[in-house]
Amino acid sequence: MRKEEIIERYSRIFPKASRVTYAPIVAVKAKNAKVWDIEEREYIDFLSDAAVQNVGHNNEKVVKAIKEQAERLIHFTFIYGFTLEPLLLAEKLAEISPIEEPKIAFGLSGSDANDGAIKFARAYTKRRTLLSYLKSYYGSTYGASSITGLDFHVRALVGELSDVHYIPYPDCYRCPFGKERNSCKMECVEYIKAKFEGEVYADGVAALFAEPIQGDAGMVVPPEDYFKRVKRILDEHGILLAVDEVQSGLGRTGKWFAIEHFGVKPDIITVAKPLGGGLPISAVVGRAEIMDSLPPLGHAFTLIGNPVASRAALAVIEEIEEKDLLKRAEKLGSYAMKRLGKMKEEYELIGDVRGKGLMIGVDLVKDRETKERAYDEAKKVVWRAYELGLIVAFLQGNVLRIQPPLTIEKETLDEGLDKLERAIADVEEGRVGDEALKFVHGW
């Protein structure tokens, strides 16, 4: 079957609400950091399936766990009975969590995990108001989309949860308060205090939802002491801190959870994407008293705690431990940041390089002074990278998303960075025509 036919059939059967594409790759095989398409072309994957493949595509340990479990028991519903696999996984998550003696509720996606976190936070505090960040992304289910700070136009069509308020995220490259790093007085923290003195009754707020590093906003890393200052304000008013580690968790930034970089302990953590190694599974990890605040079946789905997905997830965590992938992510991330920093010196198109571990953003701009986002140029870079055999995407329309598997070989990382540099050079020097714009959509 031809690639073009498959893509055309996709457009006929799947709604646009379910997908957004960057390149016409019909994948048929993958291993570690490489993907092969239906035409037998090889690609280096700098996207990790949208930050899913932390331990690499088709990881041998994960595949073995799936096969063994599928031969023995595929499913026995968690909500009515008992199986060993989700228990072992939950105990392992509790072990690596920065929350002491937590309880864990399983789900199927990051979206439903964040929906669950909303329910647990409101039930425990008996408060309704929620705080979230502008440009945040928590998922596409009803609750998760209600606290998402990106403008998707979805809420205007379908409605949203009430009592949600937004605050600016501390973006030091494009400061929402117009400050520079050397003149910053943490106005982003003072804004929260002012919010509580004005339109929001602080003692009615259940939780602040936060990404420790804003992923889909363009890999935005906050100042090191930001969350410490915010947590002090929250604690004064009995407000919970719920952190979304769906994209940043399980070693991606060089820590089990990205929030650990900032020296605070959250009350609730949501985990998903890389947890199942490609299988659908998520978790809400929270303080026991918070997690016990909902009644029986208050956050339950028929397929949660699936033995196959649980066994795969346990294998993912074991692989991260056994191969010391936290240290590897930190080391390779530091190396990649240095190489990308050198590219920034060479190419005016690169305005900023930021990130932690192997969660990196390359901010493309039309002008370094104005920081005007280079939307068309980003599309052209992604297209040229595809032609060169590199899978890369962008966020916010202009920030290249660099998130290869934590298991990527050093030489493969270098090869991918070489391809990326060539793509950027070709775009900057005008060697990629406007016809590329009609092929790349993204968001």
Curated annotation (Swiss-Prot):
The keyword Isomerase applies. Pfam families: Aminotran_3. It is an enzyme of class 5 (isomerase). It catalyses: L-leucine = D-leucine; L-methionine = D-methionine. InterPro entries: Aminotrans_3, Aminotrans_3_PPA_site, Class-III_PLP-dep_AT, LeuMetRace, PyrdxlP-dep_Trfase, PyrdxlP-dep_Trfase_major, PyrdxlP-dep_Trfase_small. The modification N6-(pyridoxal phosphate)lysine is found at K273. Its cofactor is pyridoxal 5'-phosphate. GO terms for molecular function: identical protein binding; isomerase activity; pyridoxal phosphate binding; transaminase activity. Signal peptide: none annotated. Its EC number is 5.1.1.-, 5.1.1.2. Keywords: Isomerase, Pyridoxal phosphate. PANTHER family: AMINOTRANSFERASE CLASS III (PTHR11986), LEUCINE_METHIONINE RACEMASE (PTHR11986:SF58). Amino acid racemase with moderate substrate specificity. Is primarily active toward leucine, which is the preferred substrate, and methionine. Also exhibits lower levels of activity toward phenylalanine, alanine and serine. Belongs to the class-III pyridoxal-phosphate-dependent aminotransferase family. This is Leucine/methionine racemase.
